[in-house]
Amino acid sequence: MGCPAYENEITQKPFLNPYVYHPLFVHLSEKEKQKWEKLQRKIRPLVFTIEKLKKQHKPYQKEKKVLDNLYEKRAEIVKNAEEKMAVLDGLLDSMDPDSIQDTLLFTSNVQMDGCMQMLAEKKITRAKITEEISASKTDRETGLTERQEILKGFAAHSLQVVLGIKCMDEGIDITTARVAIILASSTNPREYIQRVGRVIRPAPGKQMSEIYDFIVLGDQDLPLLKNEEKRVALIAQNADNYMDVYQLFKGKGVDLNEYQQEN
């Protein structure tokens, strides 16, 4: 995967807290499919053009910049698929107060406010850590930064769920976290391994860790699952329920063992 230092987070099984991996499948709406297909129609010829320029040893930086922008727009459609919120709603309803405790919820900027409102309606105590939540501003009375106050409340169980975006990927140590809900994922191995690593690090008294991963499925014309396979294989490989996950994906035409052989 190219990130061995981060892969150790979830491949060195003797040093992991036992965990169960739960893939949660969602689909794009018809409107989202149309947007995705429209971007694909722009991406395909551009990829061809760039490959042609490379072979001719001609500059292609301008085309590459346009292509990267299209890839980013396509990823945003998948990241913010509308059905994710409905599936999250059902997941939260299925979790009792004990099982929702010690949960990290990874969202996108677009999803953050909706998630906060959903948790509030379900009377789940929560706080969000964003780039705007200062890591340096100190409270005059406690001497703690805003982030430190949130993490203190999380460790003390006065907060059940902490929500975060990319700022949760580095520099924050939350050893008490046991559950990860990955609503918005990343295609960057370093980022998604760090997110999983937040909840599978061992800690005294920590019970089985749980990872809920939202995966967008396509159809014959939208092979979206292909983009997720390596990530799923890497996260699932040391899960206590690996064979169940393997069979689940096998039924969708994906052999996760192929990726085990690569790693």
Regions found by a protein language model. Give the residues of each.
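Short glycine-/polar-rich loops that comprise or flank the Walker A/P-loop
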Residues: 1, 16-21, 123-125, 175-179, ...
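Cofactor-binding loop segments of dinucleotide-utilizing enzymes, especially the Rossmann-like FAD-
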Residues: 108, 131, 185, 214-216
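Interdomain helical connector at the RecA1-RecA2 junction of SF1/SF2 helicase-like NTPases
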Residues: 1-101
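Long, largely alpha-helical accessory region at the distal end of helicase-like NTP-driven motors
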Residues: 222-263
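Alpha-helical scaffold elements adjacent to nucleotide-binding pockets in ATP/GTP-utilizing enzyme cores
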Residues: 35, 191-195, 227-231
